[in-house]
Every structure is written in structure tokens, then in C-alpha cells.
Amino acid sequence: MALTLQDVEHVARLARLRLSPAELEKMRDQLSNILDHFQMLQQIDVSAVPPTAQVTDLVNVLREDEIRPSLPHEQALANAPEQQDGMFRVRAIFEEE
């Protein structure tokens, strides 16, 4: 699957990456190769293979919640493109009723 430079620029923008023109070309080739491999995998007939969610029989080992120091507020917001009242500001994705 051949990606365009615009596709790669879009993905880079979503990931907040600044790529040079040479890096965009390199990423386009690499991402196109990855998508080609996925297309090959999609052609494999797995209808006779039973669905499997987990193969090791491991179970979750949970611990009690405990309050511990976390990332400082300023550091957590350092790379946020928009902030408001000390919180991340993001576009609304739900319609108000």
C-alpha cells in the first residue's frame, strides 16, 4: 500500500512529530512496507483457527491502590498544545444535547 507524503505528514502531525523532508520520505517507505505486510497477513485463511484471547493462562495480579507522588502538574502540561485552568484543553468530540 503506497502512502503519500500527505498521509505521513498527517500521521506525524497527530503524533506531534516534526519530520524533515528526508525523514518524511523514509517514513513513507517504512510505513508503506509495514502496511504491505499487514495486507499479506489479511489474506491468510484463519477460519479453522479457534479464537484465542490469551495463550499463557496468566491471570491479572492486582495490588491494593495506594496514594503515591505523581508527575508534577506543570510537567504533565508542559507539552500540551492548549491548556485552560490548569487542565488539558481538547476539542469536544461529543455533541451537546
UniProtKB/Swiss-Prot annotation:
It comes from the Bacteria. Allows the formation of correctly charged Asn-tRNA(Asn) or Gln-tRNA(Gln) through the transamidation of misacylated Asp-tRNA(Asn) or Glu-tRNA(Gln) in organisms which lack either or both of asparaginyl-tRNA or glutaminyl-tRNA synthetases. The reaction takes place in the presence of glutamine and ATP through an activated phospho-Asp-tRNA(Asn) or phospho-Glu-tRNA(Gln). It comes from Roseiflexus sp. (strain RS-1). Keywords: ATP-binding, Ligase, Nucleotide-binding, Protein biosynthesis. It catalyses: L-glutamyl-tRNA(Gln) + L-glutamine + ATP + H2O = L-glutaminyl-tRNA(Gln) + L-glutamate + ADP + phosphate + H(+); L-aspartyl-tRNA(Asn) + L-glutamine + ATP + H2O = L-asparaginyl-tRNA(Asn) + L-glutamate + ADP + phosphate + 2 H(+). The gene is gatC. Belongs to the GatC family. InterPro entries: Asp/Glu-ADT_sf_sub_c, GatC. This is Aspartyl/glutamyl-tRNA(Asn/Gln) amidotransferase subunit C. One of its GO terms (biological process) is translation. It is an enzyme of class 6 (ligase). Heterotrimer of A, B and C subunits. GO terms for molecular function: asparaginyl-tRNA synthase (glutamine-hydrolyzing) activity; ATP binding; glutaminyl-tRNA synthase (glutamine-hydrolyzing) activity. Its EC number is 6.3.5.-. Pfam families: GatC.
